[in-house]
């Protein structure tokens, strides 16, 4: 559903339903079924040099199995906000800000895989922050087109789902708290070689530092 109460403001609402099932020939299979409801509300405001987008997504799941226990019903709101600013209308220069709350539900393998699965897993959660700049230009003397982007980001991840070694076998577990920071840079350009031939070039660079904050006594803390 799309609604525009003002020329600069657009509102939308979307609803999805998903059913997932796991079936195999192993006698230990619990034959789980997951019902998921996803509701998304979005708002977009654009006026002059400013564009702002906000969203709120609600996810609710319920699982049933023919054998054994299942995780508790789950629901979570995940907000996000992004802002783009173009200070000069005659220049394709944009400054960007973004915040996003995300999560990852345990998969059927994480929960029910024979001996490895753990039905008490919690969803993996992350808070993501990003600051970026984009610049592009057309019709230069050497380049038909050139584009440069630079982004810095910071992620805070908790309840990370990992395969954790135990005495006799591996086991899925919520283990870990990670802070990750990094920089992404890209460059793309188009150079005319002849009237009908263009050379397209692109490249990227990524630097990232991830810190494990799970155990202050561990060597990799």
Model-derived segments and spans:
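Hydrophobic, lipid-facing positions within transmembrane beta-strands of outer-membrane proteins
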Residues: 1, 35-41, 60, 77-81, ...
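Short loop/turn motifs that connect adjacent beta-strands in outer-membrane beta-barrel proteins
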Residues: 3-10, 48-50, 87-93, 138-146, ...
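Transmembrane beta-strands of outer-membrane beta-barrel pores
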Residues: 17-23, 47-49, 56-64, 85, ...
């Amino acid at each position: 559903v799309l609604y525009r109460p003002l020329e600069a403001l657009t509102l939308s609402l979307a609803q999805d339903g998903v059913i997932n099932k796991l079936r195999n020939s192993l006698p230990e299979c619990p034959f789980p079924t997951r019902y998921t409801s996803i509701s998304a509300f979005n708002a977009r405001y654009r006026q002059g040099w400013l564009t702002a987008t906000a969203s709120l997504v609600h996810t609710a799941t319920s699982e049933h199995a023919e054998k054994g226990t299942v995780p508790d019903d789950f629901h979570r709101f995940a907000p996000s906000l992004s802002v783009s600013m173009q200070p000069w209308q005659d220049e394709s220069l944009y400054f960007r800000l973004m915040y996003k709350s995300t999560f990852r539900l345990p998969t059927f393998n994480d929960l029910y895989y024979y001996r490895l699965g753990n039905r008490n897993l919690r969803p993996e959660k992350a808070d993501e922050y990003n600051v970026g700049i984009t610049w592009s230009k057309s019709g230069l003397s050497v380049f038909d087109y050139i584009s440069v982007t630079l982004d810095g980001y910071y992620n805070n991840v908790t309840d990370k789902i990992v395969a954790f070694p135990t005495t006799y076998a591996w086991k899925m577990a919520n283990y870990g708290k990670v802070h990750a920071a990094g920089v992404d840079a890209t460059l793309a350009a188009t150079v005319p070689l002849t009237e009908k031939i263009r050379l397209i070039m692109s490249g990227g660079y990524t630097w990232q530092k991830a810190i494990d904050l799970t155990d202050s006594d561990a060597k990799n803390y």
